Amino acid sequence: MNKVSLLAASVAIALTGCGGSDGGSNSANDGVVITGFDGYFKHAVVFEDTNNNGQWDTQETFLGLTDEKGQLTLAAKPEKTLALQTLVPNGAKQKQLIALDAKKYAGTYTVDMDHPSQAMAHEIVFRAPSSSNVISPITDLVAIEMAKDPAISEE
């Protein structure tokens, strides 16, 4: 049980630090902002991982692409597990995105804004528990542990 408590405390501390302001003055509530990062990811796919397999499958809901701050604004928070899929040039998931709308998404790939002139080298997926507005390597570890042990809750 101590392992779970330490994991929960680590996530709470990490997520608390992610809730700060970016200095903007937009006070209107325009929806739920989902942020994906390991460095901010620009043009990463955000989707609902409805079958919890850690992959963006063709039948799963495509919610949108992240911006240069790693953010995507949604009208409402989805109820299922959120996930973020990076895209590499000519990769399988890039082709899956292009199949949705070739005109709109041709040539789209993910960039880690820590290295903005480079495309991502590998397709990766990070997941987050349904209550989280942040998708990161830490939230992915939490989602994995929760999937392994149904007794672990988000609280």
Predicted features along the sequence, with ranges:
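Sec-dependent signal peptide recognition
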Residues: 2-9
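Feature for extracytoplasmic/surface-facing segments of secreted or surface-associated proteins
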Residues: 21-155
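C-terminal motif of bacterial Sec signal peptides marking the signal peptidase cleavage site
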Residues: 15-17
